[in-house]
Amino acid sequence: MIFVLLSAVLLGVFTYSVWIWSYFIRKGIKGPRGFPGIGMLIQTIDHENPPFLKYRDWTKQYGPVYGFTEGPQQTMIISEPEMVNEIFKKQFDNFYGRKLRPIIGDPEKDKRVNIFSTQGKRWKRLRTLSSPSFSNNSLRKVRNSVQECGTEILWNIEQKVRKNEDIDMLIVYQEYTLGVISRIALGQSESNMFKNPLLPKVQAIFNGSWHVFLITGIFPPLAGVFRKMSKMLPASFIPAFKIFDLIEVAVQARIDQRAKDEIKGVEPGEPQDFIDLFLDARVPDVKILSGEANEDFAKSSVVKINKELTFDEIIAQCFVFLAAGFDTTALSLSYATYLLATHPEIQTKLQEEVDRECPDPEIFFDHLSKLKYLECVMKETLRLYPLGTTANTRKCMRETTINGVNFDEGMNIQVDTWTLHHNPRIWGEDVEDFKPERWENGACEHLEHNGSYIPFGSGPRQCIGMRLAQMEQKILLAQILKEYSFRTTKNTQIPVKLVGKLTLSPESVIVKLEPRDS
């Protein structure tokens, strides 16, 4: 009897797995298939063979629209600008969710949901409360912290230059971005660069956890089990959970300090970092734990946004700004360094602009808008190396049809950003060339608005921290290029080897920094 029941259960599971796996076959949509129950999940969480480059290869094989399964999830890959623009902007009300791995949690109900993961009215509230942190006024306030972190980096570079050492700038930039975000997001008074115990923990988020993605990708209900057991699991199992614990300590310490100040009659004053900003919007947890439904999200623009954040949401926002601000900015700087080192004539032109527009040792906020060619260099860098493809996803919240392609409710959409940014029909036959001049005088500005160029995403869910990232990049590059030139060495990987499952990362960017006064 037990054998019969077990056989029936296994047959039912197998039949269900085959039914899910055959979804795109039944739809008549091409794509790689994999195996029932797994689909292409293993291929899309491979660190050494980045999934973003697999999307590129599959697009060449199957065309600009194709699909596959990842465990029980269906994912459609697209690389046509018109369809990207339709999904990210014009039909945003049908695609306001993101593709999420099960381990992330429920975007509607999870207490520690963040602005990247959540959707609907809850996303709108978090977006509204977070936006002031990235206004020009706020960026001016944190500019000094960014500059000071850059000065620390220059001191470290100087020590290595004196020893005539090659430098892996990827590691240097990770120290820099973690130093910046630790000060402006976590309220640390010092950056602790090159001795920050948080660095390996944050690195592990992007380099590890493949086993968790695989297990929970095949069996989503286990995600909830892992989350509840997070306190008992080793730090290496799910690194992000341990960082939550560290942030919780920092937030609680700020709350305790505010309570002491209130007793003494000390006013909190202007917010100095993200924790202050979010605490100013905090209310008792009970007021919003019930959540809000997302029906008629198209009409939600007229709904009043309540300034409410729970303790858990504050922790979640600090975490996502830490993780996103650490990796993507460091990678952008790394790719720019690689491209400048391998294109010395472009580097010289950029240095001439920096010398002309930033004559003082300090890089002020108003200098940044004058660095037009630097802006072109960074745009071209992110065209050639679209590192944040993971964020260029959406989830269909309501069945719809675009250009004859049907999107069912619950389907995930992933943009093949590499193909989009390397399409010769869009960018011309010199598409593989590093050519910042293509961006001069607004020549490619229209491509930033029609779905052809999306390094920071597009539409209402475009990266909220984009301007902070750009400020960090410009200030540090200007600081370095005033003093040094990047030079390739025998240890420089040419072409650069690409790795990563969450972001597209160079394995290393080893260069020599040559003092300009030499």
UniProtKB/Swiss-Prot annotation:
> Which InterPro entries does the record match to this protein?
Cyt_P450, Cyt_P450_CS, Cyt_P450_E_grp-I, Cyt_P450_sf, Cytochrome_P450_3A
Enzyme category, top tier:
oxidoreductase
Give the record's keywords alphabetically: Heme, Iron, Metal-binding, Monooxygenase, Oxidoreductase
UniProt cross-references to Gene3D superfamilies, sorted A to Z = Cytochrome P450 (1.10.630.10)
What EC identifiers does the entry list?
1.14.-.-
Q: What are the recorded GO MF terms, alphabetically?
A: heme binding; iron ion binding; monooxygenase activity; oxidoreductase activity, acting on paired donors, with incorporation or reduction of molecular oxygen
Signal sequence region: none
Q: Where does heme bind?
A: C463
- Give coiled-coil spans as residue ranges: none
Q: Which family does it belong to?
A: Belongs to the cytochrome P450 family.
Its job: Cytochromes P450 are a group of heme-thiolate monooxygenases. They oxidize a variety of structurally unrelated compounds, including steroids, fatty acids, and xenobiotics.
* Protein known as: Putative cytochrome P450 CYP13A6
| Origin species | Caenorhabditis elegans
UniProt gene name: cyp-13A6
